[in-house]
Amino acid sequence: MSEHNSDIVHPPTKDCITRLKREFQEISKNPIENILVTPSPSNILEWHYVILGASNTPYEGGVYYGQLIFKYNYPLSPPSILMTTPSGRFETQKRLCLSISDYHPESWSPSWSTSSILLGLLSFMSDNEVTAGSIVTTNDEKRILATKSMDFNKKNKTFCELFPYLAMDE
């Protein structure tokens, strides 16, 4: 289990498991452009995502890996959102302060889904708003990190296990 999951003592509720399984089926049927996502094989509360840097952005060509850590009672509570790969936009392995994250449970809506969370994260990544967990860098610094992102990710065992088709050498 992830060290970031504060609900280790609480197994996920039946509703939580049902909802997360349904959301994964939906994402599998209707993938999100520039985002890959999969639950951990050993923990339904821990999802792993990859954001593929969009063309004509400082992130172009980058591969950004991170985690969504759901609470045992999701969708009643929002997940933690973490970024593992240095992007020049977010601190690594720090909870991100977004209205769709556990930083702001008061603004969370149970109608939001994993897809909407990931789309919100992608949108926020392209923005320059400063918040807890974000950092300020130049576009040139972001471009340099984009070129180094895959080498960084290949050193991460979990990334390589969950996204082997990305981790393979070309």
Swiss-Prot record:
Molecular function as annotated in GO: ATP binding; ubiquitin conjugating enzyme activity
InterPro entries according to UniProt: Ub_conjugating_enzyme, UBQ-conjugat_E2_core, UBQ-conjugating_enzyme/RWD
Classification via SMART domains: UBCc (SM00212)
Record-linked SUPFAM superfamilies: UBC-like
UBC core domain residues: 15-165
Known catalytic reactions: S-ubiquitinyl-[E1 ubiquitin-activating enzyme]-L-cysteine + [E2 ubiquitin-conjugating enzyme]-L-cysteine = [E1 ubiquitin-activating enzyme]-L-cysteine + S-ubiquitinyl-[E2 ubiquitin-conjugating enzyme]-L-cysteine
GO biological process: ERAD pathway; protein polyubiquitination
UniProt-listed Enzyme Commission number(s): 2.3.2.23
Gene3D superfamilies named in the record: Ubiquitin Conjugating Enzyme (3.10.110.10)
Family the entry assigns: Belongs to the ubiquitin-conjugating enzyme family.
Protein name: Ubiquitin-conjugating enzyme E2 J2-like
